[in-house]
């Protein structure tokens, strides 16, 4: 569980960071085959990750929201519509790094 993982991370002297992922690609077959709406899935994922982060006093790297707000989100996905493209991976890494950096700056 998130709670257990966060506890283990803190026990080892680190701060837990939740990697909030993205919804399947808008208009992609993985999303439509399940009958899901892109906006609803993106919102539900974001809410769930934020709730888990708040309940466990964890940092959040909200990559899903970065994908959602990107001007051309199609470019962020690999051909399968699930995994990130090279650009999507770079955005994810930047988001994680920013969350960690902000935490470090707040500790000073």
Predicted regions: what is each one?
Residues 1-108:
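Alpha-helical cap/lid subdomain in secreted, periplasmic
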């Amino acid at each position: 569980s998130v709670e257990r993982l966060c506890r283990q991370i803190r026990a080892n002297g680190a701060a837990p960071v939740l990697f909030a992922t993205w919804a399947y690609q808008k208009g992609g077959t993985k999303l439509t085959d399940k009958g899901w709406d892109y906006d609803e899935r993106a919102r539900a994922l974001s809410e769930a990750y934020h709730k888990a982060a708040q309940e466990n006093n964890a940092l959040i790297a909200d990559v899903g929201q970065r994908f959602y707000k990107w001007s051309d989100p199609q470019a962020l996905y690999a051909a399968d519509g699930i995994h990130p493209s090279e650009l999507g991976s770079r955005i994810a890494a930047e988001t994680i790094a920013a969350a960690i950096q902000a935490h470090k700056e707040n500790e000073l």
